[in-house]
Each structure stands twice: as structure tokens, then as C-alpha cells.
């Protein structure tokens, strides 16, 4: 049998699989897509040192009931780089989809606080600040049913090099938060939560 140490290790392994990535689909990003709405979300880290968390910006595009996560910008950036990346991500979305994102959701913590202040001062981006008021597991649990709306790009375009790491991070997310990184999970949570509260079923009008 397993000793206590072995049993604890086994329980830790089992503690993954909070997010069922099997329900996430794919879309053909080789074809031009028309979207109803585009939003961006950002999860920012405290610093750019190599042990720090990553800062992440996600581009989420709504088409009917589907949510296409079309691009992830991810890196360890200093504040000026973070600000530049945020503006670049917004402009990339405008140029790519000929649609101005309606909301740029930024978590009001770490460097996100200063980022919100600076972007408000320097730009006219549609900023929306969010303050996390629950632990990460509770937050993610509240949107688990929304993951089936999520679709990822299927082509081997180098811009999609983030997809495999993204799925790995989702799979590794644990209730006890002993996973290595959850910056892409956080970005996804904010998008799914925001869009779930704003989705309208057309059957309501029939």
C-alpha cells in the first residue's frame, strides 16, 4: 500500500481535472470569421523576473452562442511593455476583425491597478475593471458550464502556438491552487463570466 507521503502525492495528482477540456471545441481560423462582439481580458503579474507569473491578454470573439478564443498574448513584461502589449492587442483585434472591442476587462490587482490608471489617462480604450471577490476555485467553478461554448483555433499558424500550453494549464488547474500557473485560466474566467451574464437567448423573444 501507499505510505502517507505516497497517498498525499496521489491525492495531489487527482486534484486536477477541475476543468473538462474535452468539451472545448475548435473553429477553422483559416477562413474569415464574422463576429457579433469582441472583448479582451487581461491578467497581470507583479514583475517580469523569471520566477514571476506571466501577464496574459486574451482576445475573445462572440459568434452566436460560441466564444472563439482567437489569440493569447503572454509574457513576462515590465510595466511599459505591459502597457504597449495591451494597446497592441486591442489594435490587433480591430485590424483583424474590423470591429472595435466593446470591453477590455482588466483585473484590478498587481500591475493591473497602474495599468488601468495609465490606459485611462492615455487612451480611449473601453476599460472595465474587475476586482476578484472569491477564491479562484470558486470563480472557475461558477463558469464550468460555459467552457462548452469555448472554441480554439485549429490551424498550425505560428500565432496559435499558445493553444497546447493553454489546454495544459486548464487541465492542470487544481482546487487547492497548487498548480504552477493559472494566468490563462484567470483570463478565460473573466471572459466566460462576463459573457455569461450578457448572453441573450433568442428563444426569449419567440
Task: Put a short name on every predicted segment.
Residues 1-6, 14, 189-206:
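Acidic two-metal-ion nuclease catalytic site recognized across multiple nuclease folds
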Residues 1-44:
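ATPase catalytic-site recognition across NTP-hydrolyzing enzymes
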Residues 33-34, 52, 182:
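A generic fold-level signal
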Residues 37-39, 56-176:
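Mg2+-dependent endonuclease catalytic cores in nucleic-acid-processing enzymes, primarily RNase H-like
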Residues 42-55:
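An active-site-proximal beta-strand-loop segment
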Residues 44, 108, 183-187:
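Generic detector of well-ordered alpha-helical packing
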Residues 48, 112, 188-191:
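Hydrophobic positions within alpha-helical membrane elements
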Residues 166-193:
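Charged alpha-helix within mobile-element recombinases
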Amino acid at each position: 500500500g501507499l505510505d502517507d507521503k505516497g497517498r498525499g502525492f496521489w491525492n495531489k495528482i487527482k486534484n486536477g481535472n477541475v476543468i473538462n477540456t474535452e468539451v472545448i471545441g475548435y473553429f477553422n481560423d483559416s477562413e474569415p470569421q464574422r463576429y457579433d462582439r469582441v472583448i479582451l481580458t487581461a491578467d497581470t503579474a507583479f514583475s517580469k523576473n523569471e520566477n514571476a507569473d506571466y501577464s496574459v491578454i486574451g482576445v475573445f470573439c462572440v459568434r452566436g452562442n460560441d466564444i472563439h478564443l482567437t489569440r493569447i498574448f503572454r509574457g513576462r513584461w515590465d510595466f511599459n511593455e505591459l502597457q504597449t502589449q495591451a494597446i497592441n492587442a486591442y489594435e490587433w483585434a480591430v485590424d483583424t476583425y474590423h470591429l472595435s472591442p466593446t470591453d477590455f476587462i482588466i483585473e484590478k490587482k498587481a500591475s493591473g491597478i497602474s495599468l488601468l490608471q495609465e490606459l485611462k489617462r492615455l487612451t480611449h480604450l473601453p476599460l472595465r475593471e474587475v476586482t476578484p471577490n472569491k477564491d479562484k476555485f470558486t470563480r472557475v467553478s461558477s463558469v464550468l458550464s460555459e467552457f462548452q461554448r469555448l472554441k480554439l483555433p485549429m490551424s498550425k499558424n505560428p500565432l496559435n502556438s499558445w493553444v497546447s500550453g493553454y489546454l495544459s494549464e486548464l487541465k492542470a488547474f487544481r482546487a487547492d491552487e497548487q498548480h504552477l500557473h493559472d494566468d490563462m485560466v484567470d483570463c478565460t474566467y473573466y471572459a466566460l463570466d462576463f459573457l455569461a451574464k450578457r448572453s441573450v437567448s433568442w428563444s426569449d423573444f419567440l
